[in-house]
Amino acid sequence: MDLLSNNSKYIQINLSDIIKAIGEDGAKSILSSFSCPNKDVENFLRYKAIEFSKRDFSKTHLVFWSTLDETEKYLVGYYTIAPKFFSISKDNVSNSQYKKLSQYGEYDTHSKKCTISAILIGQLGKNYTAGNDTLITGDELLKMALDKVKNIQTEIGGRY
């Protein structure tokens, strides 16, 4: 069977929804199947993602490859997004750069800094267990994360 044929699809599920549906232990079982050469990426998903989701620091989205009839489903990757604020001092950038950046944020006259809100793609990783990394490219995973950011922008507004 050609695993990347038109008989397959990707399913993205928020880790918080998985926890609600099958509990924390069930979610941990799914996450334990994830392996990655980058141990920081692997350890975040296995040991921090649940706590970060519960505390609303960030939201992790698991990406599964599935047959159309969903008889086969494999965890192929994940990405994590979070709200982020950057404070930029006028002294640290050129006047022209500051003028451009200030269009995206709010100037605080007391601190003399411009605060800009953004959405951070904090983690992104492919699952190398049992060759699952061949079921998705890094570009596809990044596009899913960027599309999620664009959807958030559409829902809440803001300029990113």
Where are these regions (language model features)?
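Non-catalytic substrate-recognition and accessory regions of acyl/acetyltransferase enzymes
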Residues: 1-133, 140-160
